[in-house]
Amino acid sequence: MIKTMIKRCTVLVLCMVITFGLFGCNLSVNNGKRIVRIAIAQSETHPEYLGLVAFKEYVEERLGDKYEVQIFPNELLGSIQKTIELTQTGAIDFAVAGTANLETFADVYEVFSMPYLFDSVESYKAVMQDTDYMEKIYESTDSSGFRVLTWYNAGTRNFYGKKAIN
């Protein structure tokens, strides 16, 4: 039963991380390279940060003559909410944030905070991988000056209590 409950709460995983992009961001250039700035709240040992390092390596190996990727971990540039605001102003290009932070910009993200929204990991992935459906949700922040680009599963959440939850 607990396993089923955890699976049903998988959507809360999405609350962990979603990557945003900004429309018309400030184009910072260093030595002829376009600088791409990414803010993340996690430490340098966290899997999300390590994923960004892999992204940086991928981009710079293939496009290193055109792009330099800078990653700012540990809320170095401010809280998650502040980094979202930095994408809005163009000070940075991307912020890694959860859907709870997006709720203030688009009500549609409140649905992802609902427990038991999905009855299985498979149903969760089926919805999240439906690009036409998710694109409509991602577009909901356009009027706020940024676009959600994607999602990824960062694990499951747990419920704790004195009595069994059935």
Give names to the regions the model predicted.
Residues P47-A54, Y58, K82, L86, ...:
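Extracytoplasmic/secreted proteins, especially bacterial periplasmic and envelope-associated proteins
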Residues M1-I35:
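Short, low-complexity disordered leader/linker segments with a strong preference
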Residues V69-I71, V148:
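Generic structural signal for residues in well-ordered beta-strands
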Residues R37-A54, N74-G78:
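Extracytoplasmic "Venus flytrap"
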Residues G64-Y67, T83-A97:
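Alpha-to-beta junction loops
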Residues F72-E85, A154:
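Short helix-initiation/N-cap motifs at beta->coil->alpha
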Residues N26-I40, E60-E68, D142, A164-N166:
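Immediate post-signal peptide segment of exported/extracytoplasmic ligand-binding proteins
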Residues K56-E60, G98-N166:
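Contiguous mixed-secondary-structure segments that line small-molecule binding/active-site clefts
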